Amino acid sequence: MIIDHSLGLVFLHVPKCAGTALRTAWQDAAEGRDVVSFFDFGFDPVLQRQVDLAHQPLMDLRHRKEWRFLRRYHVVACIRHPYQRLASACREYYRQHSRESELQMRREPPSREQMLHYLRRLPGAMDAHDLRYVHGFPISWFSHYGSKPMVDTLLRCGQLADDLNALSARLELPAALTAQLQRVGAGDGRRPSAALDQLERDPDLRALAHVLHRDDFRCFGFERSPAQFEDPELKQLIEQSLAIGPSHALPLPNLTPQMRWYYGRSSHRPEPVLRPTRSPRTPR
């Protein structure tokens, strides 16, 4: 996350959505402005767990003092198709896993075995808010507080150059920042990496994206392609987790539509209808 107090603007860093390049552009053009960048890892004493300060889900960010700036300032976030995000998140997991796997990711994409290892563990990691898997969390966790949108302007990776030009014009951004953002839109600053086309088309990856990122497809209008699980272990995990059943028989309690307790009570998971951005506000 970047907070530009001089411009009254917050950039929410949604993982694997050009955030690193946009963050760098903002910092490179920050001379003379009051710009604060949140980065690195740390232990949050309120949440009592490790967090990635660069991109925290808004449910985690809510208790921080910086939350007031999301309410006060113009908030910008960049989004990307869930298939592309999940493939990139898988690669990022191995970039951070070890020096050996980081070097591998520079040469080639994750193998199918590596991908399945990651996909099988991602649902449980989401339940636990495990920061090692933060890049695979849904977009809506970073753009919405519950069902409430907190973003004013969305940028889309598929049309980033046009969206950045429109943002600069609409907010009348400084010339130096506009120039840096144009460089990002032109593709400057992208890290070299192996192509992920095959991973993005993998049926298990797509099928899992349909489950874990279902709100992203509906909220942001991303197109879905038919996909079925082919990996037996992953298929069994998701089928059992999506079942309506006894509380202590569910492998993952946060995916079930209804958790039933033996003494007769049950808790239902709502199906929210999310708006992509918040309504225009009167400047404060």
Kindly label every feature range from the protein language model.
Residues 1-284:
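Membrane-interface amphipathic segments in extracytoplasmic regions
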